Amino acid sequence: GFPQDPNFKIASGGKGIADDGSVFLKLDEYQWRIGVHQDDNNHGILYIGFEVDNVSKLEEAKQHLINHKVDVLDGSDEDARSRGVGGLIKFSDPSGNPVEIYYEPTLDYKFSSPVAGQTFVASNLGLGHLMILTASREQTFDFYTKILGFKLTDYISFDGGDGAWFMRCNPRHHSMALSKFGEANGMHHIMFQVDSIDSVGRALDRINAAGIKISSTLGKHINDLTTSVYIKGPNGWDVEIGAETVNIHDDDKWIPKQFVEGDIWGHHGIMDSVAEVSADLAAKDNDGKN
């Protein structure tokens, strides 16, 4: 649901739709994971949130960022209320993506999907992952690993090109991936993990029945072993629905690997999708400059 009383954080109940038309989507016991807002400027990503344990950790993160010459803003009480958290700070990564660190998210009832039997793999693993296209990949990678403390998981080279770099901040194989494709800056896809391959298949049945465009066929990634399908989202970027993603529980024993291809099988069309999303991002960027 969405907050009705400005003196309280987001409350349970309701349809999760705000007066301005914003929609808040739930995956697990967190009050919400995805905020969808009307944006006439086609910004795409309006915020990416990462959680810390408490207010002391938030203050430590703030000071750490300041020490590294990052411009940090304190989130207002209204910001915290609208996000459903105890408090937050705001800054941008070198690619221009707006990032927030927060503590004390509102938790409520367990998730119950309108699709019977559907569950997501989230909770302490976060909502899933983001694949970001960036012309400043090296600087952005250094920012997330050397300043924010993410760990490198793997590299993949696509068709001999720049490929993607995968990073984690919890046991999930990766929460963030960075790919360089020309001068494009923005999101290529967001991934949601479901509880089984059968759930992926049933989702694919619903996708086909709804006539939604499939960007990349069913396939299995070589690095995180996810079996998934990619579909075209309404804002131009892709949505990946997958299952059986690798988790990493011992950082000391994990050795990053470099792969020269992205998949064990399937995922036909994925490079065409990257090119299509990149072109769309470039067009939106040009529109914003005109």
PLM features per residue range, with description:
Residues 1-3, 9, 65, 96, ...:
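Conserved active-site tyrosine of GNAT-family acetyltransferases
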Residues 1-63, 67, 71-88:
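An N-terminus-focused feature that recognizes amino-terminal "leader" regions
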Residues 1-32, 132-174:
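Core segments of cupin and vicinal oxygen chelate
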Residues 2, 25, 36, 44-49, ...:
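Short, structured motif recognition centered on aromatic/hydrophobic residues
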Residues 34-38, 116-119, 176-180:
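Short beta-strand/turn micro-motifs at beta-sheet edges
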Residues 39-64, 66-135, 165-166, 183-290, ...:
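Vicinal oxygen chelate
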Residues 156-225:
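A compositional/structural signature marking long, glycine- and acidic/polar-rich segments
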